[in-house]
Amino acid sequence: MENINEYKICKADPEEWARYHAIYRLTKFNEWMSLSFKSDIDRYAKTNFCYWVILDNKRVGGAFIKPNIFKCIFTIPPFHNHNELIKVLTLYVATISDKCNSIVVPDADINDIDYYKNSGFCLERIDKLMICPTNESDITLKERYKFMFPRREHAEEMAHLYFETYSNNNLQYIATQSYEFQVSSVQVFFDHIKSMNVTNEWSTLVYDKVTKKFIGACTVSLVNDLPYVLDFVVHPDFQRKGLASMMMQRTLKLFFNSYPAIRLNVTEGNDAEAFYDKLGFISLSRKGYMSKLI
C-alpha cells in the first residue's frame, strides 16, 4: 500500500478531464445513458471543479470536488486501488470543507460501498436512475378532473401538494422534508425550465373540480438531452385511482415524436418503484448516497 502522503490532488482542465471521465467511469457505470460521447464531455467541459489524483507524477484517478462533496470518481489503469483513492479524496475534501456539515458522495458506485465505509462513510440510501421509451397510448380523464400546465402563480399550491404527499412517503428522509424544502423544490423546477428554455407544457398538474385543488403533478425538464421527471406526486386522498398512470402516460405520449425516452430517479425501497416497473421503466444504474461527519 502506498503512503497516503505520496498522493497529490491537482486541478484539471475540464474538457480533458471529461474525456477521461467518459471513458473510465461512464463506460462501466451507466449513470445517464447519454445520447452521445460528445454530450458526456460537454456536460463537464465548462465546470471548475474537476481534479486529478496524482501518484509518482502520474495520473491515477479523477474526481469532481467541491467543499463537503466529491463525486464522479474514477481510476486510470493500471491503477485500480479504489480503497486508497477514496481515502485520499476523503482526506483532501475534509481540508476544504465546512466542519459543521458532513461530506457527501451522492453517486457512489455500489461496488465501492465498503471502501467508502472504510473511510468513515455511512450509506444513507441507494438511488436508481430509470428510463422508459416514449410511446403512444389512449388517455381518458374523468369529468371531475382536468389537466393544466404549471405556472409560477401555482407555486404555493404546488408546494402544499408536494408537502402533503411526500409527508406520507414510506421513506423517512422523504417524509421528513419540510414545507420550506418543497417550496424550494417548486422554485427549482421553474428556474430550471427557464434556464433550459423548456416549455411548461411538458409538465402536468391535475386539478380536481370538486375540491378545487391540485391533486397531482408531474414536472419535467431537460437533463442531458432527454426529458427528466423532477417531481411526480399524487395526493394521498386520490392515490390508486389511476391518476398517476394517466399523468405518466400523458408524459410518455407527449414526447413520442420528439424524444426516444424519458428518465427519472427513484430511491430503492420507495413504494413508487413497483409503479414505474409496471409502466415499463428499467434501471440504468444504482448508486449510493454516502455521508460522513468531519
Feature roles, as predicted:
Residues 1-2, 79-145, 149-151, 288-292:
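Acyl-donor-binding surface of acyltransferase catalytic domains
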Residues 12, 34-96, 216-230, 236:
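Conserved donor-binding loop and adjoining core beta-sheet/short helix segment
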Residues 34-43, 65-69, 172-227, 232:
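A conserved beta-strand-loop-helix scaffold within acyl/acetyltransferase catalytic domains
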Residues 244, 248, 269-272, 291-294:
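Short glycine/proline-centered loop/turn elements that form peptide/ligand docking sites
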